[in-house]
């Protein structure tokens, strides 16, 4: 500027023209940089987190490693029924009318089936509140940026229902609970944040799942109570709370009396952002196998960086929090394990002791 001010007429005109050219060139370069930056950001959304060294390498369920089991697989001295036979005979579910109303995978829980679902969630919520978790009823209609934050978008976008208002239906309360503190800076003394959230959940469940397409194993709409934690940026803290979340669900399963096992998922069967995932698998007598009913994961700062969730330490420095989540309970899937493991020869079903106060009965029968 000083050079232009002190320049003679012709020189000043030349300098002004040169500046105009530079300004135009800079504008073009900035536009090009913006395009490259946008492409880079899109590519970075596909980059996965780094699994913990303890995670087994593999892509199939057979590659998972069993950590521990609880209870003996239930055996009967009579021909046991599957959950469809049991629940239809006791008018706990109506699949035919469910399909008529909601299409493929549609269902109605009714009578004691509906009451059992309510009882399970109320019992679990009470248990988690006793442990100091703050209860939430979370929204299911969610903005896309929340799915990007959790790592569900763009990879799993085809699995999510979209509305005409550009909102999406969440398949887990992990999504809205991550968004709850989006772009906030918490105080270190506020951590850990321990939440338990109930929400209706929706998943398109694209693909052929064989036997799981029948009954209420894989459905488009279900209810879930989810555990969620934000903690300090420490691997040791993440590991500690991961074990806590998993132990909470194991305790719930033990109180329900459902035989189960805990496995650590192989690298090819954990989500994009997860560092490590445990599955809890419940014993299903009609299939003579354990099947996944809970999923417990920690992410380090993978989700919090995308969501912009930080905390300010006592030293004045800021860092991204670490996030974790785990299924506390999900219905109707857990009902399969409850009714099949508690059936009697006459087709009646014993209600787990911890659910009797919520159900008002200890057995359901015709």
Cite the ranges covered by each PLM segment.
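N-terminal alpha-helical targeting/anchoring segments
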Residues: 1-74, 92
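TRNA-recognition modules of translation machinery and tRNA-sensing kinases, especially anticodon-binding
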Residues: 69-366
């Amino acid at each position: 500027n000083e050079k232009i001010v002190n320049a003679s007429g012709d020189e000043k005109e030349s300098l002004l023209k040169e500046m105009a050219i530079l300004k135009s060139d800079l504008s073009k370069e900035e536009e090009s940089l913006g395009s490259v930056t946008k492409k880079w950001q899109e590519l970075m959304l596909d980059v996965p987190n780094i699994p913990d060294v303890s995670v087994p390498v593999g892509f199939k369920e057979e590659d998972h490693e069993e950590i521990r089991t609880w209870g003996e697989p239930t055996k009967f001295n009579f021909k046991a029924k599957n959950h469809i036979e049991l629940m239809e005979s006791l008018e706990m579910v109506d699949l035919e009318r469910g399909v008529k109303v909601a299409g493929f995978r549609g269902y109605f829980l009714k009578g004691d089936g509906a009451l059992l679902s309510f009882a399970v969630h109320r019992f679990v919520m009470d248990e988690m509140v006793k442990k100091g978790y703050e209860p939430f009823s979370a929204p299911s209609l969610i903005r896309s940026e929340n799915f990007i934050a959790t790592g569900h978008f763009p990879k799993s976008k085809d699995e999510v229902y979209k509305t005409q208002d550009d909102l999406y239906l969440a398949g887990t309360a992990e999504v809205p609970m991550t968004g709850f503190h989006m772009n906030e800076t918490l105080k270190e003394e506020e951590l850990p944040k321990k939440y338990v959230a109930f929400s209706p959940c929706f998943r398109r469940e694209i693909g052929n799942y064989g036997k799981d397409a029948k009954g209420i194993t894989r459905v488009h709409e279900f209810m879930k109570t989810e555990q969620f934690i934000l903690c300090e940026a420490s691997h040791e803290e993440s590991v500690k709370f991961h074990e806590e979340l998993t132990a909470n669900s194991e305790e719930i399963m033990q109180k329900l009396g459902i035989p189960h096992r805990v496995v650590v998922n192989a690298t090819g069967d954990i989500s994009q952002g997860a560092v490590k995932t445990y599955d809890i698998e419940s014993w299903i007598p009609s299939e003579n196998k354990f099947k996944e009913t809970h999923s417990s994961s920690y992410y380090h700062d993978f989700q919090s960086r995308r969501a912009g969730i930080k905390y300010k330490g006592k030293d004045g420095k800021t860092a991204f929090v670490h996030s974790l989540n785990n299924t506390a309970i999900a219905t109707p899937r857990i009902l399969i394990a409850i009714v099949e493991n508690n059936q009697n020869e006459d087709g009646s079903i014993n209600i787990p002791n911890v659910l009797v106060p919520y159900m008002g009965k200890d057995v359901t029968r015709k």
